Regions:
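Auxiliary alpha/beta "docking" domains used to position bulky ligands
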Residues: 1-146
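Iron-sulfur cluster-binding cysteine motifs and their immediate structural context
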Residues: 152-162
Length: 162
């Protein structure tokens, strides 16, 4: 993915994405489905996130726009910017730091309840008003890495629970 090299500065410094950024809201939208595709070895396997009829970017962006509109209604000085794995953002890093899951050895973010069947997105926001700048947010802590010495997702990815 050559394009990821382009904006290394923005990936490591969120204030280059949105000036005066104060918070990053990391979100996960589940895509796990009870529908099971046929286990025919002659057919290609398609990842679950691609089973839908619509582009997940459009679905999630619509939801994020609604959330950002609500946040921005709180004050005319609040600004937001969001991405759905399509911007200069380290989605997995923000997800882990926000407590959505831990980084598995297979490089997927894994949540103890939902596995890795979710899309990641981020909302960056800042408050121009001094009243809001001084508000301290309660942040979720990163969660424990449950992988420990397990390597099943690397050895037999089809059998691991992710």
């Amino acid at each position: 993915m050559k394009w990821m090299e382009k904006y290394i500065d923005k990936r490591t410094n969120p204030s280059l994405i949105l000036e005066n950024v104060k918070s990053v809201i990391s979100l996960a939208l589940l895509y796990d489905t009870p529908v099971i595709h046929r286990e025919d070895e002659n057919l290609p396997k398609i990842s679950r996130y691609a089973w839908g009829e619509r582009d997940y970017h459009k679905i999630i962006k619509s939801k994020l726009k609604q959330i950002c509109n609500e946040i921005e209604l709180l004050s005319p000085n609040i600004k937001t910017k969001f991405y759905v794995d399509d911007g200069p953002v380290m989605d997995k890093v923000w997800a882990v730091r926000s407590g959505l899951g831990w980084m598995g050895k297979n490089t997927n973010v894994i949540n103890p309840e939902y596995g890795s069947y979710f899309f990641l997105s981020e909302i960056f926001n800042f408050f121009l008003s001094e009243i809001f700048i001084n508000i301290e947010f309660e942040y979720d802590e990163p969660i424990e890495d449950y992988c420990k010495n397990c390597r099943l997702c690397l050895i037999e990815p089809d059998r691991s629970v992710i």
